[in-house]
């Protein structure tokens, strides 16, 4: 389901917390297993830069992942992500925890997901977003679907939407323009 643009803008204006799934949202969903059991993942630099811009503009960010990964921990630390939850197969528990810590309600949350495990949070979020290559069931529970795929700029697209709706995009960009 995709809502009218005015309704999306109104929802985006209320967002104070961006919660992201990891595999399939921050990455393309592929996990490359290396000899010895280590793994690697690829992150889009534009997504990361937008996350830094968003935080400078006052948007809080959390990542909730169903897996555990030193690569994700390192990336979250590098980007200054406030909340990282791993091994969260049931994502409602960390969702409730971060809302309590940030003293926010569902309306102030944008959640971005790609698979059926994300549906419970998409149902609750003030702005529910599925990435372009999300499974169809996930798209059905989203207010919008990005034009970009997970791990390929979808997060930047969402952040740009939120910051523009809040009138903060130009200011966020000005830091990098000098």
Q: For each of these PLM feature ranges, what is it?
A:
Residues 51-75, 85-86:
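Substrate-recognition element of Asp-dependent hydrolases with the DxDx(T/V) motif
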Residues 1-20, 168-178:
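Non-catalytic pre-domain segments flanking phosphatase-related domains
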Residues 27-33, 73-79:
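Short, basic/glycine-rich phosphate-binding loops at helix/coil junctions
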Residues 2, 16, 30-53:
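Basic, amphipathic juxtamembrane/active-site segments
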Residues 12-31, 122, 155:
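Asp-based phosphoryl-transfer active-site loop
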Residues 14-16, 59, 107-108:
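Short coil/turn segments at beta-strand junctions that form active-site/ligand-binding loops
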Residues 37-41, 78-79, 83-85, 92-178:
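Mg2+-dependent phosphoryl-transfer enzymes with acidic/Ser/Thr/Gly-rich catalytic loops
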């Amino acid at each position: 389901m995709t809502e009218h643009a005015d309704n999306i803008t109104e929802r985006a204006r209320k967002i104070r917390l961006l919660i992201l799934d990891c595999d399939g949202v921050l990455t393309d969903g592929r996990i490359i297993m290396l000899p010895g059991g280590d793994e690697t993942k690829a992150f889009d630099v534009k997504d990361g830069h937008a996350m830094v811009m968003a935080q400078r503009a006052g948007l809080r960010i959390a990542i909730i992942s169903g897996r555990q990964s030193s690569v994700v921990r390192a990336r979250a630390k590098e980007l200054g992500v406030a909340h990282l939850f791993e091994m969260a197969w049931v994502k409602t528990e960390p969702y409730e925890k971060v809302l309590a810590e940030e003293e926010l309600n569902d309306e102030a949350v944008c959640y971005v997901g790609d698979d059926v495990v994300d549906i419970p949070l998409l149902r609750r979020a003030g702005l529910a977003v599925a990435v372009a290559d999300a499974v169809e069931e996930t798209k059905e529970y989203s207010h919008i679907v990005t034009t970009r795929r997970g791990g390929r700029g979808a997060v930047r697209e969402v952040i740009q939407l939120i910051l523009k709706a809040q009138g903060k995009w130009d200011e966020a960009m000005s830091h990098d323009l000098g």
